[in-house]
A protein has these predicted regions:
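Metal-dependent phosphoesterases centered on the DNase I-like endonuclease/exonuclease/phosphatase
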Residues: 30, 51, 125-211, 215
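Active-site-proximal beta-strand elements of phosphoester/diester hydrolases
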Residues: 1-9, 98-110, 142
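N-terminal, active-site-proximal structural segment of metallo-dependent hydrolase catalytic domains
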Residues: 1-47, 51, 57-63, 176
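Active-site beta-strand termini and strand-to-loop segments that position acidic
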Residues: 70, 94-97, 221-222, 240, ...
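Conserved beta strand-loop-helix elements of the APE1-like EEP
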Residues: 60-75, 196, 204-226
């Protein structure tokens, strides 16, 4: 199976930059997007052969997630059943016979870390949600996690130590996710690979210089380790300030 995750940074804009062509070329079994920035009815996306599931933020033009899947799931859940967290359309969970598929757009801690305290609460609650699912069956989760875990995961670690996405607090929360029994699939296959990123600022010609961050992930329950085949980051694909990431898994 081929699974894709892409923060499209506004789907309507991404559609004008080749989203549908890239979607067809990638031909994923499950395709997850984050930061759709849509309200219901604002786009009619014709994707033959796919079931579509959307979670919208209450606030217009903000956040939002979607999953497009060739196989109809057994059930669909929106959010994580905590009202404080479920206003921004950040999580969708599809249940399949053998696993749960979760996509997430993790809250950004923002300039001057204004939202870091909220982010810390989110991290604890989202991990608890994942572990609750895992009691039923294995979990695959993907999305823009808004954290570069280690220094190898961004071009300029020293100058970003106190910036959103690379604070000690955020990195420690992701370490806890891994310690709890999840695998960062890209690092599982490529533990020492440098210079591979999934997000670049639109400023300072960052993508041209490859001054990026790896903040988009596929993580899986330890019990799925033997089914992993490959993990890829599609740095060749444009259309957003993020590029798609991929997981190949035998399920």
């Amino acid at each position: 199976m081929k699974l894709i995750s892409w923060n499209v940074n506004g789907l309507r804009a991404c559609v004008t930059k080749g989203f549908k062509e890239r979607f067809q070329e990638l031909d994923a079994d499950i395709f997850c997007i984050q930061e759709s920035k849509l309200q219901e009815g604002q786009i009619d996306l014709d994707l033959p052969g796919y079931y579509q599931y959307w979670n919208y933020a209450v606030k217009k033009g903000y956040s939002g997630t979607a999953i497009f899947t060739k196989q109809e799931p057994l059930s669909v859940r929106y959010g994580i059943n905590i009202e404080e967290h479920d206003q921004e359309g950040r999580v969708i969970t599809l249940e399949y016979p053998e696993y749960f598929m979760v996509t997430v757009y993790t809250p950004n801690s923002q300039n001057e870390l204004a939202r870091l305290p909220y982010r810390m609460q989110w991290e604890d609650d989202f991990l608890a949600y994942l572990k609750g699912l895992e009691k039923e069956k294995p979990v695959i989760f993907c999305g823009d996690l808004n954290v570069a875990h280690k220094e190898i995961d961004l071009k300029n670690p020293k100058t970003n130590r106190k910036n959103a996405g690379f604070t000690d607090e955020e990195r420690e929360k992701f370490s806890k996710v891994l310690e709890s029994g999840f695998i960062d699939t890209f690092r599982y296959f490529y533990p020492d690979q440098e210079g591979i990123y999934s997000w670049w600022s639109y400023r300072f010609k960052a993508r041209e210089k490859n001054a990026g961050w790896r903040i988009d992930y596929f993580c899986v329950s330890e019990s799925l380790k033997d089914k992993l085949e490959d993990a890829k980051i599609h740095t060749e694909i444009f259309g957003s300030d993020h590029c798609p990431v991929e997981l190949d898994i035998c399920l």
